[in-house]
């Protein structure tokens, strides 16, 4: 933590130069009609990894982590600044849209959501809007607080996890475009079941600005053929 608080912007950027070089290489390889998305973790999620040094376990002691409120606010403020800078650099390298992952938003205590989740993400959202950079935000695990997040942060697009009812999402976000939601576990089912569930999603979001995607990452045990089937089903709809 001390090392992070002492690091300066130029050293931070130098450390991440391989990321920007990789984006530039990819940009030069893809077709002109293909959009390149860059990403970063949200301040709260990065803070969780910094203090826990790994993915939080079921017995993760959130109260212990939140003891030093002054330190947390100090770290979040610096993370906000560095994340904005990192996203800008990725856009300069060739990316066209930014996605911000708040993968551990779901473990923020309810009385801390405003300060630790909504406001840090709002700062990033406002910064990107000022630079005319489109954004997608993914506050995983917020459940029905997703609506409050969307109303406060007002991203260009909001990504939903698999616990969110798609019908509820369509009615709740004041026409903000929606991405994701499809359960990765569904890809472990038969092709006919996958087809049925994909069609259900596509019908729910018909005539709505929707980007089909999973509600989280592909599970390691997923058969690649099922992914190809998923893509074909979407394209044939």
Range-by-range predicted roles:
Residues 15-237:
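Active-site loop segments of alpha/beta catalytic cores
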Residues 1-10, 33:
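A contiguous, low-structure linker/loop signature
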